Amino acid sequence: MAETKSAPIFRNRVIDKKQLKKLIGWTFAHYGTAKTAVVADDLKALGFRYATRAGVSISIDDLKVPGSKAELLESAEKRIQETEDRYTRGEITEVERFQKVIDTWANTNDELTDRVVKNFRESDPLNSVYMMAFSGARGNISQVRQLVGMRGLMANPQGEIIDLPIKTNFREGLTVTEYIISSYGARKGLVDTALRTADSGYLTRRLVDVSQDVIIHEVDCGTSRGLFVEAMTDGDRILIPISQRLLGRVTAEAVLDPSTDEVLAEAGQDINEDLANRIEKAGIKKVKVRSPLTCEAARSVCQKCYGWSLAHAQMVDMGEAVGIIAAQSIGEPGTQLTMRTFHTGGVFTGETARLLRAPVAGTIKLGKKARTRPYRTRHGEEALLAEANFDLVLEGKGRKETFAILQGSTIFVQDGDKVAAEAILAEVPVSGRTKRTVEKATKDVATDLAGEIRFQDIVPEEKTDRQGNTTRIAQRGGLLWVLAGDVYNLLPGAEPTVKNGDRVEVGDVLAETKLTTERGGTVRMGEDNGSSTHREVEIITASVVLDTATVKAEASQGREHYVIETKGGQRFNLLAAPGTKVTTGHVVAELIDSRYRTQTGGLLKYSGVEISKKGRAKAKQGYEVTKGGTLLWIPEETHEVNKDISLLNVEDGQLVEAGTEVVKDIFCQTTGIVSVTQNNDILREIVIKPGDVHVLDDPDTAAKYDEGRLVNAGEEVFPGLTAEQLVWAEAVDGTDGPLLLLRPVQELVIPDEPPVPSQDSSQESSSRSIRLRAVQRLQFQDGERIKSVEGVDLLRTQLVLESEEGSSQLSADIELLPDSKDPETLRLQLVIIEPVVTRRDVASDTTHGSTHTELRVKDGQKVKPGAVIACTQIQCKEAGVVRGIQEGSEAVRRLLVERERDCVTLDLDVTAATQLQPGSLIVAGTQLVDGIIAPESGEARAIAPGQLQLRIARPYRVSQGAVLHVEDKGLVQRGDNLVLLVFERAKTGDIIQGLPRIEELLEARKPKEACILARRPGVAHINYSDDDAIDIQVIEADGTQADYPVGPGQPLIISDGETVDAGQALTDGPANPHDLLEIYYDYFREQLGEDYEAALESLRRVQALLVNEVQSVYQSQGIDISDKHIEVIVRQMTSKVRIDDGGDTIMLPGELHELREVYNSNNTMALTGMAPAQFTPVLLGITKASLNTNSFISAASFQETTRVLTEAAIEGKSDWLRGLKENVIIGRLIPAGTGFKAYEESLLTDVDGGYEDRVYDDDLADVVIDDRAARSYTLNEGRDFSRSMTFAEGESMILDDGEELIDDSSASLRNLVDVDED
């Protein structure tokens, strides 16, 4: 731009942050970098100079609280008090009250904020707080509001709003309560920030990884495709105007002025600020521009499709790494996005509706056309709902105002009403957003006073769900009254001792519980702990004591245990510790007995011994002996080993002496014949069998003793040999021939009945007697081989607890008692105790009455079954009349005493006739007779002449569909839940917002509660069935119909008879992008009849959805990001297709390939008349796309390194080093910026090019260049670095095994013709 010496222009305006931005931007656009730097420098100097002179700082006097704050709060308090009164009178429900309170405070807060700003602007425009916040230097309006307005509503840890706002600001100071309430949100803010930075960083890393190889490689890809760009809106609001979205784009076709048909821009022209503004002024709604999404450049984006580089408002340079710029642009603002929004339940009306206020006082006229119906607002106010559009007229003094009322508006005035100025007339929904999505929510209502329930107009209905749970639901709404009274909870099993209508005084017994014993027995009192009422009472129903045996404590191996010694000298180990409980069948003690202990392992045979049938399935304790006899024991020593056979030092059948090393490190303890068991050259066991050895000559004898058998004393074993005692004869293979082994047999005698120490038992009734029984248990079965080197116990004698009665699960306590004659001696006693729990009398008792417990028995007393041990009484605390005992109902759990203070007596004029019936329910504020208004709500009682008694009561409004927790005439304590209100509230925006939403979009995750999408276009019909289920039928043009069942909790967003398109959402919720892509692809394939075009069109739709969704999240937080950055990322997510059937190409089903690659390959197939590949477009999340990139080095450095590298190695992949990351890893110059020029040629003459005759230099060019060398390559003398092999004349690229070296991408273009033409 030529500089002209013209007079400087003086602009007299406030320069704030926005103006500064504009100023520097303007300077940069017109004068370039150097001059802008000078201007910025001067501005900085100017700013600092004046900031220093002014000495701007915040002192406490700068925080000026507007004087009108007090009256604002007062009016809010008044409105809230009115709401509270309405609630107390039962005119509105708890939900409506809450909603009204929240909205009142929210509006007050906004109002106050406006006052604060106005106050500053009018009275003190140079206030430092005001200057800082409004110039954009520091702070914002919400922070100023907290400093000098009010802090406002806070949320609790669950994210619900607390209906008590912080009315003070930091200037006035907070109370302790307010301080604590603030800390919830403060803590949440800190935690969120910490998490956010990590999440945001990881998002940026994934974005960089997916787009790092997108570099501007060519000037123009020559595509005719493009995207339509229009302004981004949300209802009426324009989020991004079209001029802003067009800036720096290149037009795809000529732009014409709709009114004059003048050409505003040619095709292929880049749009600067002036042109963008002219297009917007001309009223053009959409313009077709080039976009990275439709660019046809291979593996990159071309200059024209990308447009301006936003850094310097010029066309982007060649070799610019636009992918990384895009990733950083999207990732950087990540930290500014809030993690979660508070889920408040429809805050402020201001967001979703416009309020119409009366400009002047006047009278309302609703025209003839007005069609309205009564409607209850969410604040419980009666209003009218407009059913059609009409005009509302306000006639004031000398002027007439007309308001357009849209269908769905809420009107707060009636025809003919007189209104004051600024009164709210109506709430008009913001157009485009009339269908606000709602969700079901519930709220519990607890009672504020104890008393008796009465239903008024409520019709309860019982509903049983599939699980058989019954809920009572209010079919019709109404009032639920709680009539005051003192409610006593009765203890389980308590019986009332009074009747309805009885008069009771303080201390009278209302109910009592008797504690009885079930079995009877001897009473034993616990320690007296000083409390007269509460002592542990135990009743011993049966006991057994070993009266002659003593118990001694013995220490062995540092541990103490008890031993029982009987008169007969037997010693038992006490297995159950004193103080523990044992059940029937449990072992209490075990005889210390060495008679049945063996020296080694061996073979066990029973002779005459019988064991109980029960114990056959080897019990843990062993087998119980039912009949005595003899055990025959044939000893043998068994070594179980697991070693190599080479370590064996003896042979099978060899005779060894005791102490021989049979296997390395294993010595035998007995003398005998060795028997070795081995398996696959691994030794399993070595058995040494002691006994007398005789050589056998006769094979028949050997066969006779093959299995082994018992030979009695005096019996002939074989001719010439007679057994002298009982032996076990067994034939073995010796080292030199067959041998007969006579093994000694030990005989162990078992008595039929083992001895039992004497015991003395006592029991209260024949039903329960217990005793100790001695049981002999064998550890092993008949014929069992015990493999062991050490000895084992064959038989154990145990004392077991037994009871006469069938009840197996009796538990007895083990106690040690000092003997009555000699206190030093301890005796073992087992007792069965029935515990009787007597109540502690605690003041803060749930019965909320005074309970009093007294014992009726003494220590040591014998009691019969059913005798009363103790008695607990509930005593009256305040005199009154008993009510609320429901006759004939199941056990009475509560009773009510109506006290004096639960009633009010009103004096009426004796003459005044009253229409009131006794028992009628009266709301506070009702006129009873002329001039007398009920001071409290209540139930009318005894009406004497001139007097009216009211029993105080509290009404609660119950809305229809609420869940009732109480019954009519039931009794409730204060704080009990009465009812669960079910209501609908507006969903606050998108529940998932900010980072999680962006992540969900870019990772292409399936949303949690996805909407239902129409698969085909048609007309929708909605059918409602009885159980709240909805069925949508879409009838297509040719009459076919598709059914879409809608689950509960999925709100519809279409109306009956509406025409729907393919892929349109039928219910509320985010769409699943994968389903959408599939629906579009199927639809367009049918419409267009061609796979490639259908894939492009379906991908284009999904791309547009993703770009707009990501944009809207950033916009909602007030962050501006250029569309092209998001488009670059989305391009990487939507460039691949999945092969369904490879046809005659070299692609395999299930592989992911670039869409363009498949298209080229299919064209080649079409030329040669072969079968093309069938494919489906896929949407990859950024992580998946990064792992599926062409470069395995880049993918491996991102995630799943081992898997990526193994797969690459198995597939024999080559990495052509096209991106930045792979070059950085290998240590080459990156192909961007100056390095791009050095690589440019190698990247353009790609292996994808044709295989024309090539002449190679004999000297190998060095492919690795460094930064210094790269700078010397200019654009025009680029050298080709892709030739890294030299060939002699006539040679082709042949490897030894006759395979040609080509990569996947070139394979598709080979035309299946031999290339070697030299």
From Swiss-Prot:
It catalyses: RNA(n) + a ribonucleoside 5'-triphosphate = RNA(n+1) + diphosphate. Zn(2+) binds at C221, C295, C302, C305. GO terms for molecular function: DNA binding; DNA-directed RNA polymerase activity; zinc ion binding. GO terms for cellular component: DNA-directed RNA polymerase complex. Keywords: DNA-directed RNA polymerase, Metal-binding, Nucleotidyltransferase, Transcription, Transferase, Zinc. Its EC number is 2.7.7.6. One of its GO terms (biological process) is DNA-templated transcription. Its cofactor is Zn(2+). It is an enzyme of class 2 (transferase). Binds 1 Zn(2+) ion per subunit. The keyword Cell wall biogenesis/degradation does not apply. Coiled coil: none annotated. DNA-dependent RNA polymerase catalyzes the transcription of DNA into RNA using the four ribonucleoside triphosphates as substrates. In cyanobacteria the RNAP catalytic core is composed of 2 alpha, 1 beta, 1 beta', 1 gamma and 1 omega subunit. When a sigma factor is associated with the core the holoenzyme is formed, which can initiate transcription. HAMAP family: RNApol_bact_RpoC2. Belongs to the RNA polymerase beta' chain family. RpoC2 subfamily. This is DNA-directed RNA polymerase subunit beta'. It comes from Synechococcus sp. (strain ATCC 27144 / PCC 6301 / SAUG 1402/1) (Anacystis nidulans).
